[in-house]
Amino acid sequence: MKVKDILGSNPLNKRHRGPHRKPRYRGRDLHEGGAMAGVGAIHISEIEPTLRKLEKELGLNLRDFTLGSVGKKEFSGDIDIAINLKPEELADFGKKLQAAPSTQEVKKSSVFMTSVPIVGYDENKTRDGLTRTGYVQIDFMPGDPGWMKTYYHAPHEKDSKYKGVFRNIMIASIAGRIDVVVGDEKIEDGRPLVQERWIWSPTDGLIRIKREPKPRKDGNGYTKAKVDTPISNPIRDPDGIAKQLGLTSGKDLYSFETLLSALKKSYKGEKIKQILDDFRSNYAVQDIGVPDEIS
């Protein structure tokens, strides 16, 4: 799942765009940013042997820390893995990644990216329009694995018609419409001088913030930017998140469909309309297409 697609902002952009390079399968250099060249999708049957081989080379458990839809659908475009490392340990991890026999070119931005040969690659396992090269991109994402599994969760393709991004946009839409407290004073463009609200954050979870317009450096009015100041402890456990959102349990957060069902049970009338309008207007939803259930 690409975080840029989740909230319509770009807090941790994982869809790394940059100049495509000719595939490099010799040498292992560390570069900054950019998607890996020469990679393609991996079949679900190839994921475990590919990661098992890389686990032996890195001395790390990888299979238990995959994120998003990996292993939940027949083909995955790449593999995202959470790594629980302190900031001071990342440089050594980068060196270890470069030295691993399987890794090809290694790139680093907010995550470590590499390509590896797919173990047990079967070129006959494919479908129309799918790129299969025998190599797959693996992104290593530093952070708390437990929380990242919650945030980057994607439902199994048999359980939902929609990607995990829709789930997160729905959570964000609900959060943005509950317990909003807006001050009476407004600035020239009509925005409130201060408001308190909940937001769905890729780093903090569900958290209540005080939102204020950002002052101009010269002191004359405000910019279009905003300043969010946390005023509560973050909520990261699924049951706690669901409770604060006015839903029943963490199971309601499983997919877009379960969230929509829970929303209709917990809210009525204008509140549902506001939440669904916010969801529909999200740029990622506009780009992918509004779900049939609410179109």
Residue ranges and their predicted role:
Residues 1-13:
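Short acidic, low-complexity intrinsically disordered linear motifs used
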Residues 126-294:
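Catalytic cores of NTP-dependent nucleotidyl/adenyl transfer enzymes across multiple folds
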Residues 57-67, 94-115, 180-189:
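Short secondary-structure junctions
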Residues 53-57, 85, 106-113, 282, ...:
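Intrinsically disordered, low-complexity eukaryotic regions enriched in glycine, serine
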Residues 98-148:
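Conserved catalytic core of two-metal-ion nucleotidyltransferases
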